[in-house]
Every structure is written in structure tokens, then in C-alpha cells.
Amino acid sequence: DVYKRQTHHNTGDQWCIYPMYTFAHPIEDALEQITHSICTLEFEDQRPFYDWLLERLAESGLLQTPPPRQYEFARLNVTYVITSKRKLKQLVDEGHVAGWDDPRMPTIVGLRRRGYTPQALQLFAERSGISKSGGWIDYSSLEGALREDLDEKAPRAMAVLDPIKLVITNWDALHGEGTLDSCTAPVHPHHPERGQRTFQFGRELWIERTDYEETPPKGFFRLYPPQTLADGSTKPGNRVRLKYGHVIQCTGAVKNIDGEVIEVHAELVPDTKSGTPGADSVKVKGVITWVGLTDAVEAEVRLYDRLFADPHPDAGGKNFLEALNPDSLSVATAYLEPSLAQAQAGDTFQFERHGYFVADREDHKPGRPVFNKSTGLRDSWGK
């Protein structure tokens, strides 16, 4: 009905006409001086009425020409995403997400908080194109557009997301107790004009827990202790380069009463500091990232992933709530290199080896940094 005797929340009882959408759509477009009204394919059958009503309004002098034009295209469907406002509202109302700006939500505020840039979204739209036939765009295309945009922009930094302490047992003997060694790295490897960043190497560092294996699998080139071989001989612990720093050789580890490794021990190989003469004389296959214990910045890092585990969560009458990904968010207490202490809300960085991260627009504060994972360095979903 277009006539309904009911109080309106804005105009009260002054106006009692509630036009149907089909009737209101062309009039509102004309009043707002819309030139191109872009609709999905289900509105194609309504275009004759849309044009007819605008023609009548023009004939009566109530509408300035030229009138709006309606165009219909297929909906842009992205795998692992739902765009139904009703279903998105249900996710918010039932607490499955933290709000409309939750970084897992496909809303503008959600994507922005996740670290998506206007340029990345424009690139994604250009690559997706327009069509009259329905289809699906893989979520990896959206992430790929973001990676391509951020690769040129984002400063680099080292971060340890699952930390375990590394102790260089011969550091004091080689360099003196309490001594620190400054290491440098480019802010951006492809833009030397953006300068260098500096951090401290010392006796105690943080490394990723996964960079140590007590019994290494085949092809593991990171840290492991001396190994006893089948013939009874001993294979020395593995050597790796600490990126931008020195080569070290693993000597063992310390465990707690439950048998969990809580500390990795290694010895520094002298004269192997990156950028110094002879540094490459010792060849290693593994390079790992690290953060110095003395100047590390502790931070909350929110590791976001796809909200749904099913590529088509609401297709064919499915209950989309049953397709929610239980691992779409995990929170880590991480250690970051000192350059990130100055990060402002909304700043984006590439955490080396991990991916692209953005300082959260709501919760990131001086002295309490919070970073959201935007995307990995490559598409690894389901791999």
C-alpha cells in the first residue's frame, strides 16, 4: 500500500503516504539528481516502470531532464563472504562478531579496520569487472589486490608472534657482559631513500617457537640441537643466520617440568655479522627473524582469517551460522622491533615472514599497541 495511517518516526502524523519501493526508487533518484542507478539483475524487470514514471514526471514539468538511467549488472559474489544485510545484522546482534566494524566483516568500516585501502578495493573491482551473468570471485583475488598495493607502501619490521627466548651463551665472552650490538635494516627494500631502521642485538633475543625443533623433520633448515645418528656419531646443531645480524649454531634447549621447551641455547659464530667483511664466509641454508629482548615492544596482535570455512556459506538454503570458521580470530602476545613503538592508529606494516598488519583504529594506543593481520604474504588458505 502507498497509503497507510500510521505515525512516522520522523514526520509524525503530517504525512501518511508510504510508497512502495518500485514507485519510490525512480522519484528518489530524480530528486537526488542521480545520473546512473546501478542495480542487480533482479531489478531488470522493473526498468520499464522506472523509465515510464520518469517520463510522466518530465511531461508534467516536475522533473528536470535528463532523467536518471537504470543499469543492471550481476552481483559481485566473493567466496567465503556473505553480503546480505539481514544476515550481517544477525552476526552482529547474536555476538558472532564484535560489531559492524569487526575486521572480519565485509563492510566498509570493517575492511578499513582490517587494513584495506581504497586503492586495493579499486584494483579488485577493476580486475573483477562487470557482467550480466552471475559468478563467483575467489577471496584470494581480494587479498591479492591488497598485497599488491601494500607491497610498495608498507614499511618493513620484524615481529615474533609466538615467542620463545633464545640465549647466546658465548655472547659475554665474545663481546662483554651487558654489551649490545646495533643492527640496521632498510625501512623498505625497494626504496633506499626511505632510510634505515635500527635495533639491538644482545645475549638474549626472542625468536619464533616454530623456528626450533628438537627432532627436525627432513628439509628443516632452522634451529635444532646436536643429533645422535644411527651409527652412534653426533651431528652438530644447525647453523642459521639471524636476519640482519649474526650466524649462530644451536647447542641445546631448556625444558620445564612438563617437558616443554622454554629456552633455546646457541653460540654466536664470530665475524659473521651481516654487512661486514667476511660475513658470507659461513654458508647457511636457514634465515630466521628475531627481536632483541632489551628493546622489544610488547603488543597484542589479532590474527584474523576468513569468517566462514565454507566458500558458499549461504548457498542452497544452508544455515550460514553452521559455516562459521572457529579459527577466524586468534590473539597473540607478540614482540616487535622498536621502530613500531611510534606507529599510529591506521599505519600499515609488513611483518617480515608473516604478512601485512595494521595498527588498530580503535584500540591501538601509545604504550598499548594493537595490530590486526590484514593478509599473509601469500595465499595459504587450506594449505
Model-derived features with residue positions:
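Catalytic core of the metallo-beta-lactamase
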Residues: H8-H9
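Catalytic adenosine-cofactor/nucleotide-binding cores of aminoacyl-tRNA synthetases and other
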Residues: A30-K383
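Active-site beta-strand/loop architecture of penicillin-binding DD-peptidases
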Residues: G12
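Conserved phosphate/anionic-ligand binding catalytic regions in large, soluble enzymes, centered on
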Residues: I17-L31, Y116
